[in-house]
Structures are given as C-alpha cells and as structure tokens.
C-alpha cells in the first residue's frame, strides 16, 4: 500500500519502530507507543462508528494531559480534522468556533461541561461528545456526553484505516487575540515540512525519507521533551508531533507552575524545555533564584516561541543554568517558524530572532507578483513552497 507524508502514517512509523518506549507522561501516568497506538485506534474506530467521516471536524477542548495526545492521534487516524479549542474561551467564542469550524464531534474535559451545555443548543451539528474525567462534577449526561475511556473501550484496536493522503488537511486555529479565530488550513505534508520536523531547522534541508525519523528513533535513546504551553498553542502541537514522529518522549502538565516545572525536569530527566517568552520565563527564573535541590543536569536546550523573550531574562537563565543553549523563535499559525536566534554562554548576544532569508523567500509587489532581484521595485517579504492552502 502506498504511503504518503500523512501525520498518522508518520506517527505509526515511530510506533512500529519503538513500541515499548514511553511516548507520553503526565503526572504519575504514562503510555508507551504501543499503548498509545491501541487507544488511538480505538478512538478512531469509535468516531467512525459514530458517523464521523473523512475531513469532518472534531474539537479538542482540553488542557495538556495524556488524553489530549490520544485524541490528537486518534482523530487523524480516523481521517478527521482536529480543531484546537482554547479552554479559556467564554461561551460566545465557543459558539463561534463550533459553528465556524463545522465541528461534528467534541472531546472535552468535564470541567467545561456547563459551557458546552450552554453552547450546544445553537450548534446542533455537534453530535458526538466524549468527556475526559478531571475530578470535577459537572453534569455532561444532560446533553448525551459519554465518558472518554468507556466510549473508546468498545472500539477496535486494529490499524485498518486504508490509504492516506499527503493532501489531508490539518487545521490550526489562531488564538483570536486581535479578532475572531481563523482556521489556518495546512496540507499534512506542508505542515510536516514547516512545523513538525520534516525539515532540518539548522540546514533547511528536507528529511529525505518518511521513515528516517523512525529509523533514527530505533537507533538512539529517546530525548525527553517538555512543552509547557497549552496544546491549543501551535508550538506545543509542533513539539508533540515532532516527538511522536521521532520516537521521543513528551512530558505534559495541565497547569503552569514554575516550581513544578523544575521539579518535573528533575524527576523525568527532561532534555528539551519549550515555553512562550517572558510570561513563562520570568516565573521560571524567579523559582530558580529561590534555590532548590533539583538535579537539572539533563536539561540542555530551552526554546521559546511566539512571544517576547527579553535579553535580560535570557542572560539570567544562562547565569543560573550555565552551559545550556537558549533559542528564541518567531512565527505564526500561517508561516510556521519564521526565524530563530541562538544564545549560549560565552557567545556574543545576537539580539532577537530575525526572519530567515532562503530559497523559499520572495518579495511581492502591490499586485502580488514576484519582484525580480535588482529591479528596484519595493514590496513585501513573503514565503513560498510549503505554505497553507487558505483559511
């Protein structure tokens, strides 16, 4: 059977390469790649049995936890399209997102049941609802919600979903901070190349073979990645998919607590930490300054994306954590990574990240035509190649 650069296929290559390796950790819970495969297959079959069809939209309304990774993989295995739902949205924003995305199914944490109950009467196309228990007691049965693990238990564990396409759509909703959220539509192959590890970020060269990441996983011990931002953030989706494709281990936590971050790094021997600028870096610095007995020697990379990351905070982190590397990246839901700066102890500070100029960079005039070098015509910088297909 022909295999394309499809997200589900890429994850399955790693699952086959390292089935007994730990895929995801949250608190005291963890799943191996084989266990993740079993549960994701069951979820995919449950969704299909409930009438979810190829390219249907399935909302994911959860904080970072193991079930969110099961759901992400299960949704793409079913051929459906994931809709990232911001758990901070109020009912008006939820109503807009449910309607705008044409969502037909929803996976949500129980703590959001009251909001969901108030929105569903206006969004009757949302017909299948799975609820992840989180210790809260809101009533979800009033609108036909079914407990997550009970629902998927009856689903088949088999991987029998047929041929997939690189042209399948991955939908990445913007945060909606400057207006209504927009669903950025990426082909699976394109977002893999731009955000999910299909391009070497250092050289700009494509990963040549779809099995390369899985082969490397089998040949090397896993890196432990800890993305702090919520999964509604494209950066954490990126970090999680990259880890899954390459057989690495992802550590998640439902809430941000700076002291708990360092404790988690100590406990799980985290190698790569992902966060969003000063909003997270300042509390992390403050927690370190207070002092602790944590062994942080496993940590070698701290990566910030999509938010202001002040030079003074970078320098303080390097002072507290010498011999580490810090990266600061810019980008968006529409572009992926736009540029990265690297800071390390003993090196000259190069300032913030700058847009990378390479073979995918063009200048467009006011009519959208590509400007020829040396013509003297002014325009705007744009990116070509692996880009979204629209909103």
Regions found by a protein language model. Name each.
Residues 192-228, 232-272, 287:
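Conserved AMP-binding/adenylation subdomain of ANL enzymes
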Residues 1-5, 137-168:
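Flexible, low-complexity linker/hinge segments
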Residues 3, 12, 20-65, 69-73, ...:
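Conserved AMP-binding/adenylate-forming core of the ANL superfamily
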Residues 32-34, 169-205:
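Conserved AMP-binding A3 loop
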Residues 49-50, 77-150:
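Structural core segment of the AMP-binding/adenylate-forming
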Residues 63, 108-117, 135, 229, ...:
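Adenylate-forming
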Residues 19, 155-173, 180, 215-224:
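Conserved pre-ATP/AMP-binding loop-to-beta segment of ANL
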Residues 36, 248, 266, 289, ...:
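Conserved AMP-binding/adenylate-forming
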């Amino acid at each position: 059977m022909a295999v394309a650069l499809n997200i589900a296929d890429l994850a399955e290559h790693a699952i086959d390469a390292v089935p007994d390796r730990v895929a995801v950790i949250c608190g005291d819970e963890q799943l191996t790649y084989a266990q993740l495969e079993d549960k994701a297959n069951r979820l995919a079959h449950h969704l299909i049995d409930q009438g979810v069809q190829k390219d249907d939209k399935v909302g994911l309304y959860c904080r970072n936890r193991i079930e969110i990774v099961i759901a992400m993989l299960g949704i793409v295995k079913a051929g459906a399209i994931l809709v990232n739902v911001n758990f901070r949205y109020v009912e008006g924003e939820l109503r807009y997102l449910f309607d705008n995305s044409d969502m037909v199914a929803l996976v949500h944490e129980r703590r959001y049941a009251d909001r969901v109950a108030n929105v569903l009467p206006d969004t009757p196309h949302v017909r299948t609802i799975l609820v992840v228990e989180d210790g809260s007691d809101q009533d979800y049965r009033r609108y036909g919600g079914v407990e997550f693990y009970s629902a998927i238990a009856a689903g088949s564990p088999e991987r029998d979903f047929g041929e997939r396409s690189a042209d399948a759509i991955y939908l990445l909703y913007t945060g909606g901070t400057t207006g209504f959220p927009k669903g950025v539509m990426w082909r699976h192959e394109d977002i893999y190349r731009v955000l999910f590890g299909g391009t070497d970020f250092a050289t700009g060269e494509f990963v040549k073979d779809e099995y390369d990441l899985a082969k490397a996983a089998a040949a090397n011990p896993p890196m432990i990645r800890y993305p702090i931002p919520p999964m509604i953030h494209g950066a954490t989706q990126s970090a999680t998919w990259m880890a899954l494709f390459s057989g690495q281990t992802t550590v998640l936590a439902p809430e941000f607590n700076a002291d708990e971050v360092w404790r988690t790094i100590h406990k799980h021997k985290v190698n790569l930490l992902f966060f969003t600028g000063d909003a997270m870096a300042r509390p992390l610095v403050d927690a370190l300054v207070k002092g602790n007995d944590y062994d942080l020697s496993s940590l070698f990379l701290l990566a910030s994306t999509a938010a202001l990351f002040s030079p003074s905070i970078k320098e303080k982190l390097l002072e507290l954590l010498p011999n580490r590397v810090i990266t600061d990246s810019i980008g968006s839901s529409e572009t992926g990574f736009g540029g990265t700066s690297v800071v390390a102890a003993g090196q000259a500070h190069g300032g913030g990240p700058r847009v990378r100029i390479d073979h995918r960079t063009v200048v467009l005039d006011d009519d959208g035509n590509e400007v020829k070098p040396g013509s003297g015509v002014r325009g705007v910088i744009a990116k070509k190649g692996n880009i979204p297909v629209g909103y």
